[in-house]
Amino acid sequence: MPISYRMLLILTLYIFELCRCVDASERPVVKTEEGVVEGIRLDAGGEKVDAFLGIPYATPPVGNLRFERPLPAKPWKGKYNASSKPAPCMQSDFPIYQDIVLDYTHSSEDCLYYNVWRPTRSCPDDTETCNAKLPVMVFIHGGGFQFGDSSLFLYDLSHLAVRSNIVTVSFNYRLNFFGFLTTETADMPGNMGMWDQVLFLKWINKNIAYFGGDPNEVTVAGHSAGGVSAGLLAASPATKGLLKRIIMQSGTPLSLLAGSTYYSPDKFYDVSRTLGCHNGQAKKKDLDLPKTIKCLKKLDARKIIRSLLRLNLGQRVFSPQEGDDFFPYDPLAMDTWKNVHVKEVFAGSNLNEGTGFLSYILKHHHDLADNLKVDYRATITAMLSLFADVPLVTGKRMVKAYFGGYEVKHEGQKVVELLSEMMGDIVFKCPTHLYSELMALQGLPSYRYLFAYRPSYSIFPKWFGVVHSEELPFALGSLIFSTDPTRTSIATDSLPRGFLGRSYTTNETAFMRQLMDTWGSFVSTGKPSIPLRDDEWPSYTKTRHDIVQLMPFNYTIRFDKSQDKCELYRPFMIRKGAGKQPRLRIVSPGIAASSGKPISPAVASGANRQPGNNVAMSLVACCLLMAMRHLFATIV
């Protein structure tokens, strides 16, 4: 019987509708406070994950909103297409290793976006709401507060979401000049990048339940500068009730902010002059701040980046500062950390954090390399005095702890290796040890790890060992995406063919799963797990410094051997009896946030800073900033 035109049309429409429905099933939909978002369904480790990518959480901080605290995103109508990752925040191109560079010409001021991943199985009905109430992990990327973005394949958290049955989230925050420039007055208090993080945690609290997450079970995790951020957020009065746990990977507040890193009272004056917003004839105290800020807001962002590259490192580094109502306390004061409002802490570092940094420094500072050859003891002692305000007598004791007495002689490579160990202790291991100890003193369950595995695909010399960032693709589950061109970002398009996609072993795949289980256990329960064994992860306490060393198929409980050396640095990283009252330097207009009293001119100008700490521990910041130069070289 011949098919009529009418029947054919009906059949065609039916098939079209069927195809459309099948297509729609691959586009999960969620209704948030701002509007409806439509994500995509992806494969991650053999399972399906719902990904919602590149969604705004704030109004673009452009024009008059540059240097201002972020405003919530405006509501939208219709469905927001959340199928691609966002552009990174404004930054310069990033040298990775030798002539290999990440191309950040596509970076933008319009960058305050987030990504969410959830296991598809947790919300099988494909409705606009999901009541799964899964634990949530919010990850903050590193980069010394100068570089980085959430779109790099390294931070693809989809595999971790399905493996651990949690909701994972990443996001961008303003960096460098755009995120941390400050006048140290109410005209431009600064810390915009940190207020971005605060606003996003508030967004999480209001919206993550729509994605199947539990707003009462939020873990904030971060690497390097992201770890510093997690620690600051845990004590900020602006985030109380917004997070329950923190994970700090190779970075704590004692790492980057120790001694007011790269602080200079003249930085705003100098930078605004470089950018042509005043001619330098007016004295700093006579500078018309509102007029200068208005000028800076009108400048082209890319022109700013190019101009700043002509300055030396100290002039163009902008980092979080204490003294506003985000962080009104002295970060080096022991009493500051009595204000922490999280329940559990998980922190750690890698076995050889200092090797990559020192190698880079020696390559670009031949005078230092030459001085080490002539007299390494005197050179290192002088560096400690210059960069960290360490008295010469104390500096000699520090050098002796690593190099032995004067009767012990070292040469060449051995000097470099011992100095690398010292730098790793100063920048990462000891800040992590001391911060974990401070948490334990507050009665918080605190857990420590030491990542001790050198990947088979490492491109560095063997003596480098296990360098900064090498745990990331294992712990975050992104190792499998290094060979997937669909998971890379625009920034990696400039990399030479073959740089990405290096092979990894089946044992490394298994190790990745073990670390994901450990991280996922902490996010879900507040305690990391030891795979393949019934042993419990020991707490890190004031009297018992147990850590777990991480190797494939071998998690070993051991005593933290670095604590004796860390005692040498304690007086420079933690000040007893200081900071009992908020040490306000910047406040909201006219009012001291903690007391309600008008701010004094001395406080407003930053006059309460200790002169001896203006450049204290800047070696720490220098090393952290250099870490990003080695990021991809150490993981791919």
Question: What are the functions of these language-model segments?
Answer:
Residues M137, V198-L201, N205, G231-A234, ...:
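Non-transmembrane alpha-helical segments in soluble domains
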Residues M1-F16, R20, R609-V620, H630-V636:
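Classical eukaryotic N-terminal signal peptides for Sec-dependent ER targeting/secretion
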Residues G280-A282, I304-S307, G443-L450, T525-D535:
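Acidic/polar loop patches that form or flank catalytic/metal-binding clefts of enzymes
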Residues P2, Y14-M194, P215, P485-D517, ...:
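Non-catalytic accessory segments of hydrolases
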Residues C295-T509:
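Substrate-gating cap/lid region and adjacent catalytic-acid/histidine neighborhood
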Residues Y14, V101-L289, D325-F327, A333-L358, ...:
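Serine-hydrolase-like catalytic core of hydrolytic proteins
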Residues S588-V620:
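C-terminal GPI-anchoring signal of eukaryotic secretory precursors
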Residues F52, E109-Y113, P135, V342-K343, ...:
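Extracellular structured ligand-interaction cores
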